[in-house]
Swiss-Prot record:
Gene Ontology process terms (BP): L-arabinose catabolic process to xylulose 5-phosphate
Gene: araA
GO cellular-component term (any): cytosol
EC number(s) per entry: 5.3.1.4
Pathway it works in: Carbohydrate degradation; L-arabinose degradation via L-ribulose; D-xylulose 5-phosphate from L-arabinose (bacterial route): step 1/3
Organism expressing this protein natively: Thermotoga petrophila (strain ATCC BAA-488 / DSM 13995 / JCM 10881 / RKU-1)
Co-factor requirement: Mn(2+)
Cited InterPro entries: Ara_Isoase_C (IPR024664), AraA_central (IPR055390), AraA_N (IPR055389), AraA_N_sf (IPR038583), Fuc/Ara_isomerase_C (IPR004216), Fucose_isomerase_N/cen_sf (IPR009015), Lara_isomerase (IPR003762)
Catalyzed reaction equations: beta-L-arabinopyranose = L-ribulose
Name the UniProt record assigns to this protein: L-arabinose isomerase
Pfam families: AraA_central, AraA_N, Arabinose_Iso_C
Length: 496
């Protein structure tokens, strides 16, 4: 469902007419070699497109106008090969709506000690050209990612590739919508938020449909489509064949088919449900939700559209990478001193992209919702480094709370627990990480990912100009408290 190849990134090289045609031709040739080399590297998720060397204010303004108007353009990469006076860039940068990366590099890796002359010096001027360009970004208070180093370095390419994935997620969020079936769970605070502000800052269009519309579509699903889907279930999962289970699984298959049709029709990228508003649905969507998350849709339970949007954004960032991303909830604790752990799960809706084993379809009673016993996928989660992230609405801005965690093996069987689960150690440790999370107001609903790291989420928050706080192995609680206080002042003074 998610295709990062549909996007492209424009590579903009700055110079000026002062240098003359011969030098400008060399600038273009060297830029072309850089872009060709980058495009040959499979680390990059999308094509990088070299645009003509920019030498005047009118050329710069025109290229940004075109970038803004092109839905395929997910971001722009700028590099000043020579000195490009930054007043020429003000009009273009002032209208730019795309995520921007400032690449500070040089065509040649090393100084040619024996042959260097003033021709070489005049051609290779990014050392001061990019400083001039950096000033105008800082002066205009523009969000941007800065990557420094030679363009052939692995670390440089990794940082560019991460940012490109983030930019794709931003573009994706600006073009689809989040579908809500019903409202938020009653009386819950952290799942609420300003949907108008979300569309302004994050690009997410969030709208609600009555669950009755979905229920009518479920009733109309043909039996042959259900049987085709059951064949797929048997191939991908461990599936029971008893009559009680098959009846419940068929109902989830109907919900999945109807949901997918509805989401495609609405150009949706994510959706929410709530157990308090099920109308004529036969079951709370479980297996159906897990399957759609597996395809790439974002999801939030109990009407949590912020979690749904974040899950989708991270799924876009992690497309094609090892690991997976899921809606998650901090459910219960293991509090053995020195080995405190968090068991993450939800009633039904954990994405199988984070499974370490072949998932099992199981049918069990569910005490909430008042509907028939729902089918769901059950599995243990993957092990290794992961992130937990939550968006909360602080009244005057959104705050992204991020915690680095280590997912650990589940060493004991839990035969009576009928839900998918993952066990993790928060960094730096349970007490400090959880204290910081609670101080920051992080939600009980999160996006959990083994596919990305913290840098992706920092890039995302900075590009969208929203607040973020990171809880990791370097956490100092007193400094963290100060950061929260300073952020209150900064974001309170900041004008949009």
């Amino acid at each position: 469902m998610i295709d990062l190849k549909q996007y492209e990134f424009w590579f903009l090289v700055g110079s000026q007419y002062l240098y003359g045609l011969e030098t400008l031709k060399k600038v273009e040739q060297q830029a072309s070699k850089i872009v060709d080399s980058l495009n040959d590297d499979p680390i990059f998720p999308s094509k990088i497109v070299l645009k003509p060397v920019l030498k005047s204010s009118s050329e710069i303004t025109e290229i940004f106008e075109k970038a803004n108007a092109d839905p395929k353009c997910a971001g722009v990469i700028v590099w000043m090969h020579t000195f490009s006076p930054s007043k020429m860039w003000i009009r273009g940068l002032s209208i730019n709506k795309k995520p921007l990366l400032h690449l500070h590099t040089q065509y040649n890796r090393e100084i040619p000690w024996d042959t260097i002359d003033m021709d070489y010096m005049n051609l290779n001027q990014s050392a001061h050209g990019d400083r001039e360009h950096g000033f105008i970004h800082a002066r205009m208070r523009l969000p941007r990612k800065v990557v420094v180093g030679h363009w052939e370095e692995k670390e440089v390419r990794e940082k560019i590739a991460k940012w490109m994935r983030v930019a794709c997620a931003i573009q994706d969020g600006r073009t689809g919508q989040i579908v809500r079936f019903g409202d938020n769970m009653r009386e819950v605070a952290s799942t609420e938020g300003d949907k108008v502000e979300a569309q302004i800052k994050l690009g997410w269009s969030i709208n609600t449909w009555g669950v009755g519309e979905l229920a009518e579509r479920v009733k109309a699903v043909p039996d042959n489509e259900v049987e085709e889907l059951l064949t797929e279930y048997r191939e991908k999962y461990i599936m029971p064949e008893d009559e009680y289970s098959l009846k419940a699984i068929r109902e989830q298959a109907k919900i999945e088919i109807a949901l997918r049709e509805f989401l495609k029709e609405k150009n949706a990228i994510a959706f929410t449900t709530t157990f308090e508003d099920l109308h004529d649905l036969p079951q709370l969507p479980g297996l159906a939700v897990q399957r759609l998350m597996e395809e790439g849709y974002g999801f939030g339970a109990e009407g949590d559209w912020k979690a749904a949007g974040l899950v989708r954004a991270i799924k876009v960032m992690g497309t094609g990478l090892p690991g997976g991303t899921s809606f998650m909830e901090d459910y219960t604790y293991h509090l053995t001193p020195g080995n405190e752990l968090v068991l993450g799960a939800h009633m039904l809706e954990v994405c199988p992209t984070i499974a370490k084993e072949k998932p099992r379809i199981e049918v069990h009673p569910l005490s909430i919702g008042g509907k028939a016993d729902p089918a769901r996928l059950v599995f243990d989660g993957q092990e290794g480094p992961a992130v937990n992230a939550s968006i909360v609405d602080m009244g005057n801005r959104f705050r992204l709370v991020v915690n680095k965690v280590l997912s650990v093996p589940i060493e004991r069987k839990m035969p009576k627990l009928p839900t998918a689960r993952v066990l993790w150690k928060p960094l730096p440790d349970f007490k400090r990480a959880t204290t910081a999370w609670i101080l920051a107001g992080g939600s009980h609903h999160t996006a959990f990912s083994t596919a990305i790291d913290v840098e992706y989420l920092i890039d995302w928050a900075e590009a969208l100009e929203i607040e973020y706080v990171v809880i990791d192995e370097n956490l100092d609680l007193e400094d963290f408290k100060k950061e929260l206080r300073w952020n209150e002042l900064y974001w309170g003074l900041l004008k949009r």
